[in-house]
Design a protein with these regions (language model features):
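Gram-negative outer-membrane beta-barrel transporters
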Residues: 452, 550, 569-656, 692, ...
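C-terminal beta-signal and adjacent terminal beta-strands/loops
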Residues: 592, 647-655, 661, 673-719
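Structural signature of Gram-negative outer-membrane beta-barrels, strongest in the C-terminal barrel
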Residues: 248-252, 368, 387-391, 395-399, ...
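Short acidic/polar hinge/loop motifs at secondary-structure boundaries
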Residues: 137-161, 179-181, 520
Length: 719
C-alpha cells in the first residue's frame, strides 16, 4: 500500500552543516580530463572495490546487484543499468528518481517533482514500496513508512530489471533499485560545494575521507549537506540536511569491516500534485491550473521526517576458496504530515467565478523500526572443466510500523484566486495500526563458466510472517506464508564482446492486508522470460544492452465489486517489451548515454471484466532519452564542458477504463561547466524550454505536472 493509495482511500472515505546541499563533483574519478575536478588517486575500500566503487565515466564494468557477488555486468542474466557518480554530477540530479530519468525500462518521476519521495516504475510496475535497496539490503516501505536517500551520499544507483526474489526474497516483480553508498577511501579526499537554483533553494555540501593511520588499516568517509529555500510552488519552505559517516577497518588483505551510518532531517511544505484532469491535462473554463499553484494551508502545512541508519559490512577470506560475509543494518524513521489535499472540484465540475476545488484534511504520524541481516558464504572452485562461484546465504528482514492516519473535512480553495488562512475542520482517525512483518530466507546461487558459456542457477525459499493490530475498528489479521523463487540463466561470451543470454525466473512479493472477510492476502507472484544481448566492444569503451521480456504479475489487488473500500485478489497484469540502452566513453572528453523502451502492458484478469485487455493507468508504453557530454581537452578552452539531453515520455491513461488520455511530452535538458585547477563551476537547466505537461494521473482527480524549468548553479573546490 503506497502513500498515494493511502491518501486516495482517506479522501474517498470523506468525500464519498552549516551548509546547504545538493550533488557534488565526483570525488574518485579516474578521468580528470572529462571536466570533473582532477582529484588525487582514490582507493575505494569495500566489497570488491570495483563493484561498489566509482564508475569510469559513464560505462560500468562490474556490479553486485543481481548476483550479490562481484560480477561483470555481462555475466548477469538480466538487464542491469548502473548510474555512476560522474553521470549524476554531469546532470546535477538532486533526487534518486531524477537520476533515473535517462534509464531504459524505468519511468521515473511519474508524479512530478515530489519533494519528499522518490517514485519510479520498472517494466510497468511501481517499485517504490518493495523495490528499493541500499547496499543490497532492503529499504521496505508500507504506507508512509518509507525512507528517503539523498543522491549526494551515493556512489552508484543500480537497476536490476525483472524479478529479483531468487536473491533478495519478497520484492517488486518489475525490478529493484539498489543504492550504493560512498565508501571510505585511503587517500586524502577533501571537497566542498555550494550552489543555488532558480526556485531560490540554496545548498552546500562536503565530502571528506582518507586514512586514519600510516598503515591505512583505518580509513573514513564523511559526507554531508544541508539545503533550504523555495520550491516550484508559489508558497514553499524546504529545509533538509544529511550527514553520513563511514569507517573501514582492514587489518589484513583478507579481512575488512566497514561501518556505514547516516542521519537525515527534513522539514518542508507540500508541493504540487493531486490536481484534477480537467484543468491540467485538458483546459477548464478558466484555462489550466498553474504549475505554481499551492493547494495546502501555510499556517498548518507540515511535513517532518527524522531518519537514522547504522549498519556494517563484514568480509573475511577464510582461504583461497571460501569467503564469509555478513551485512547488517538497523534503520529508524519518524515522520509527521499535516495539511489538506484537493480532490476534484466542489460539486464535481469547475463552476465560476472561483472554480473551487474540494479539499480533504489529512494527517498522519508514522514510526518505523526495521533491521536486515544477510549472511553469505562464497566459494570459488573448479569441477573438471567447470569453474564455479557458489553463493550460500541466510537472510532475515524485520519491519515494524506504528502509524496513525486521520482524515476530515477541509475548506474548498480556488485555483485561480486562492485565499489562505481559513480554519480547517477536524480530522478523525480511520487507522491506528501496529504492523510487523518478518521474512527469513535461505538462498543458493551457482555461477558456472565453461569456456565461453555462463550459466547462473538460483534457488530460494522464504518464510514470511505478518501481524496487524488496529485500534480503531479495522480488521486485525495475521498470516504466515512460504514461497519458493528461482532463476535459471544461460549466456555465451564471444571474443568480440557480445554476450547473448536467456533467462527464466519466478518471483513473489508479500501483500499486506486482508479482504472484507478478514482473509489475509496471498503474496503476489510473477514469472518472467527474458532474452537479450550485452555488447562490450573491443574498439571503444562502451556497453550496449538489448533485451526482450515477457513478465506476468499475478494475485494483483483489485477493487472488490461487492464491498466498497475493500479489495480482492483477482487481478493479473502482463508486461511485454523491448529495452535498448547504450553507455559510452567515446573519447577522453566525449561521453554519451541513450535509452529506448517499448512496452505492451495489459490487464489480463480483473474483478471488473470490462477492464480486461486495457492498459493500466499511469504507465506510458514508449520511453526514450539521450544525453551527450563533451569537455574540451586542451587549448585555451581546456576544462570547458557542455552537456545536452532529451527525454520523451509517451502517452498514458488516467484510468484503467482507458477513457482519459494523458498526452506524450518531450523535454530538453542542458548543462555547461568549467574546471580550472582545483575549482569548478557548473550551470544545469532542466526542462530547458519550460514545457508544461502532465507527467501522469492516478485518477481523474489526481494528476501531476512534470517539473518546470529550473536552473541550478554550483561551485566546487577541492584541496
Amino acid at each position: 500500500m503506497n502513500r498515494r493509495y493511502v491518501l486516495s482511500m482517506g479522501v474517498s472515505l470523506v468525500s464519498l552543516a552549516v551548509m546547504v546541499a545538493s550533488s557534488s563533483q565526483s570525488l574518485a574519478q579516474t578521468q580528470p580530463a572529462s571536466g570533473e575536478i582532477a582529484l588525487e588517486t582514490v582507493t575505494v575500500e569495500g566489497q570488491g572495490g570495483s563493484a561498489t566503487g566509482p564508475v569510469n565515466g559513464y560505462v560500468p564494468n562490474r556490479t553486485t546487484t543481481g548476483s550479490k557477488t562481484d560480477t561483470p555486468i555481462e555475466e548477469i542474466p538480466q538487464s542491469v543499468s548502473v548510474i555512476g557518480r560522474e553521470e549524476i554530477e554531469d546532470r546535477q540530479a538532486q533526487k534518486v528518481d531524477e537520476a533515473l530519468r535517462y534509464t531504459a525500462g524505468v519511468f521515473a518521476q511519474p508524479y512530478g517533482l515530489d519533494s519528499d519521495t522518490d517514485w519510479f516504475f520498472i517494466r510497468g510496475f511501481d517499485a517504490g514500496q518493495t523495490g528499493v535497496f541500499l547496499n543490497n539490503l532492503p529499504l521496505y516501505q508500507y504506507g508512509f513508512g518509507g525512507f528517503y536517500i539523498d543522491p549526494f551520499v551515493l556512489e552508484r544507483i543500480e537497476v536490476l530489471k525483472g524479478p529479483s526474489a531468487a536473491l533478495y526474497g519478497g520484492s517488486s516483480i518489475g525490478g529493484i533499485v539498489n543504492l550504493v553508498s560512498k565508501r571510505p577511501v585511503t587517500e586524502p579526499l577533501r571537497y566542498v560545494e555550494t550552489g543555488v537554483n532558480s526556485w531560490g533553494n540554496g545548498y552546500a555540501a562536503f565530502d571528506f575521507g582518507g586514512a586514519l593511520d600510516k598503515d591505512k588499516i583505518w580509513s573514513y568517509r564523511l559526507t554531508g549537506k544541508v539545503s533550504g529555500g523555495g520550491w516550484e510552488t508559489e508558497i514553499a519552505e524546504d529545509f533538509r540536511g544529511v550527514i553520513a559517516p563511514a569507517f573501514t577497518f582492514r587489518p589484513n588483505a583478507g579481512t575488512e569491516l566497514t561501518v556505514l551510518a547516516s542521519y537525515q532531517h527534513m522539514d518542508l511544505m507540500h508541493t504540487g500534485g493531486f490536481l484534477p484532469y480537467v484543468g491540467t491535462v485538458v483546459p477548464a473554463p478558466f484555462g489550466r491550473i498553474s504549475r505554481r499553484f499551492y493547494y495546502s494551508e501555510p499556517d498548518i502545512d507540515l511535513y517532518r521526517r527524522e531518519q537514522a541508519m547504522i549498519g556494517y559490512e563484514f568480509e573475511h577470506a577464510v582461504n583461497d576458496v571460501w569467503t564469509l560475509r555478513q551485512n547488517f543494518r538497523y534503520a529508524h524513521v519518524d515522520s509527521k504530515e499535516r495539511g489538506p489535499y484537493p480532490f476534484g472540484y466542489l460539486g464535481g465540475a469547475p463552476v465560476g467565478p472561483d472554480f473551487l476545488l474540494f479539499r480533504v484534511g489529512f494527517n498522519h504520524h508514522t514510526v518505523v523500526n526495521t533491521l536486515s541481516l544477510d549472511n553469505q558464504a562464497e566459494a570459488k572452485f573448479g569441477t573438471g572443466p567447470l569453474n564455479h562461484t557458489l553463493l550460500l546465504g541466510l537472510d532475515y528482514k524485520y519491519y515494524d510500523i506504528d502509524h496513525i492516519q486521520a482524515a476530515g473535512g477541509g475548506t474548498p480553495i480556488s485555483p485561480v484566486n486562492p485565499i489562505y488562512g481559513v480554519l480547517q475542520g477536524p480530522t478523525v482517525p480511520y487507522l491506528d495500526q501496529d504492523l510487523t512483518m518478518s521474512q527469513l530466507g535461505f538462498y543458493a546461487q551457482d555461477q558456472i563458466r565453461y569456456s565461453g558459456w555462463i550459466a547462473t542457477l538460483n534457488g530460494r525459499y522464504d518464510h514470511v510472517s505478518t501481524k496487524s493490530t488496529d485500534k480503531v475498528g479495522a480488521a486485525n489479521f495475521s498470516d504466515e506464508a512460504g514461497e519458493f523463487s528461482g532463476r535459471l540463466g544461460l549466456g555465451y561470451e564471444f571474443e568480440n564482446g557480445m554476450t547473448p543470454y536467456a533467462a527464466v525466473s519466478r518471483s513473489f512479493n508479500p501483500v499486506i492486508g486482508s479482504d472484507f472477510f478478514g482473509q489475509s492476502f496471498a503474496p503476489e507472484t510473477g514469472q518472467q522470460y527474458e532474452v537479450g544481448l550485452k555488447y562490450r566492444p573491443t574498439f571503444i569503451d562502451a556497453l550496449i544492452t538489448a533485451s526482450l521480456f515477457d513478465l506476468t504479475r499475478q494475485n494483483v489487488n483489485t477493487t472488490d465489486p461487492e464491498h466498497s473500500f475493500f479489495e480482492v485478489q483477482l487481478g493479473e497484469v502482463r508486461s511485454r517489451g523491448f529495452e535498448l540502452e547504450a553507455q559510452a566513453n567515446i573519447t577522453a572528453g566525449l561521453k554519451a548515454i541513450a535509452a529506448f523502451t517499448a512496452y505492451d502492458i495489459e490487464i489480463t484478469e480483473d474483478s471488473n471484466p470490462l477492464l480486461i485487455g486495457n492498459r493500466p493507468n499511469v504507465v506510458p508504453e514508449i520511453l526514450a532519452s539521450g544525453w551527450l557530454d563533451y569537455t574540451v581537452q586542451d587549448g585555451p578552452f581546456k576544462g570547458l564542458g557542455f552537456g545536452a539531453g532529451v527525454r520523451y515520455v509517451g502517452f498514458s491513461y488516467a484510468d484503467n477504463e482507458n477513457t482519459l488520455k494523458v498526452p506524450a511530452a518531450t523535454v530538453f535538458d542542458a548543462g555547461i561547466r568549467y574546471t580550472r585547477d582545483n575549482f569548478t563551476v557548473a550551470l544545469n537547466v532542466n526542462n530547458l524550454f519550460d514545457n508544461e505537461y502532465v507527467s501522469a494521473c492516478d485518477t481523474q482527480f489526481t494528476c501531476n505536472y512534470g517539473a518546470g524549468r529550473v536552473a541550478t548553479l554550483k561551485a566546487g573546490y577541492k584541496w
